Amino acid sequence: MKLNTLQLENYRNYDEVTLKCHPDVNILIGENAQGKTNLLESIYTLALAKSHRTSNDKELIRFNADYAKIEGELSYRHGTMPLTMFITKKGKQVKVNHLEQSRLTQYIGHLNVVLFAPEDLNIVKGSPQIRRRFIDMELGQISAVYLNDLAQYQRILKQKNNYLKQLQLGQKKDLTMLEVLNQQFAEYAMKVTDKRAHFIQELELLAKPIHAGITNDKEALSLNYLPSLKFDYAQNEAARLEEIMSILSDNMQREKERGISLFGPHRDDISFDVNGMDAQTYGSQGQQRTTALSIKLAEIELMNIEVGEYPILLLDDVLSELDDSRQTHLLSTIQHKVQTFVTTTSVDGIDHEIMNNAKLYRINQGEIIK
């Protein structure tokens, strides 16, 4: 898929702007705080209906404006289609081909993106919450079923936590309702866990050879899914559900005393091992960076396999930080296949082959100067 045009109205520091996009590489150059990252963020937000930089949509609206609008025309192998996102201080509205979508699960997946920013090192060295969000953002783009299962799980988790808190405070005494909630909780916990396990397995298969290539076969990467609910995946669905219910039943008193759910996908994690050692704890910054890049490049290939279209790659101020070896592997992945948007303060240090296939835009105070 390609983004042909991007139109912004009242988005961050942009008043009105239209970007006609190059099908290969688009380089956004400018000093800091001019709007480069805002433009990249708008593409991400158009794809996922949420920003990667803030959870408050109101921050996306230009100062003193009543709304923000993002619109993009996409081309696929079989035609073109517009996507629109309209943000007000009361909420947001999304449209596919001019038709409003009542649920975000119906919207997400029409535009797939992979973002690589300096903070993506936190996928390796940050908290489990960051890694769970990474799984949800990437898997959610390629599986509407996963998005729905995750939304149902989060709804039931909230209900269960509210009831556990009432039990802890003595406001409720009946455990029957907790047993009912646990039954629903177990069903969706199993679905989310199953899909995450499969996703990590597929991602590892693609990331391993990429990582080996970047390191000239000196390092071996492995991904390990660490689910909070541990059960035998080889069992049939009924047996797995029974095993989860047994875990929840055995820990019902503990959860009641703590007033919170102690087990479930909301406590999952992933570990990244390099040559058998945990990269988070023992990896150098170079190893952590290579691991993060390998994961991102694997995402690109996995999305193409799953949906039949390459995603759009967003590189936020990272390209010039990659050494020649990493840039070479990045180039071999994206060249003439993946439409890419790059932000940078200088083109120095960017591979000349990337520059030869690129269109340069200068960004100055929320305006695009070609």
Curated annotation (Swiss-Prot):
SUPFAM superfamilies: P-loop containing nucleoside triphosphate hydrolases
UniProt entry tagged with the keyword Protein biosynthesis: no
Ranges that cross the membrane: none
Keyword Cytoplasm tagged: yes
Entry's Gene Ontology molecular function annotations: ATP binding; single-stranded DNA binding
Organism of this sequence: Staphylococcus aureus (strain bovine RF122 / ET3-1)
Functional description taken from the UniProt entry: The RecF protein is involved in DNA metabolism; it is required for DNA replication and normal SOS inducibility. RecF binds preferentially to single-stranded, linear DNA. It also seems to bind ATP.
Lineage: Bacteria, Bacillati, Bacillota, Bacilli, Bacillales
One GO location term (cellular component): cytoplasm
Cellular localization per UniProt: Cytoplasm
Family: Belongs to the RecF family.
Main location: cytoplasm
Protein name: DNA replication and repair protein RecF
Binding site residues for ATP: 30-37
BP GO terms, sorted: DNA replication; DNA synthesis involved in DNA repair; double-strand break repair; SOS response
Keywords associated with the record: ATP-binding, Cytoplasm, DNA damage, DNA repair, DNA replication, DNA-binding, Nucleotide-binding, SOS response
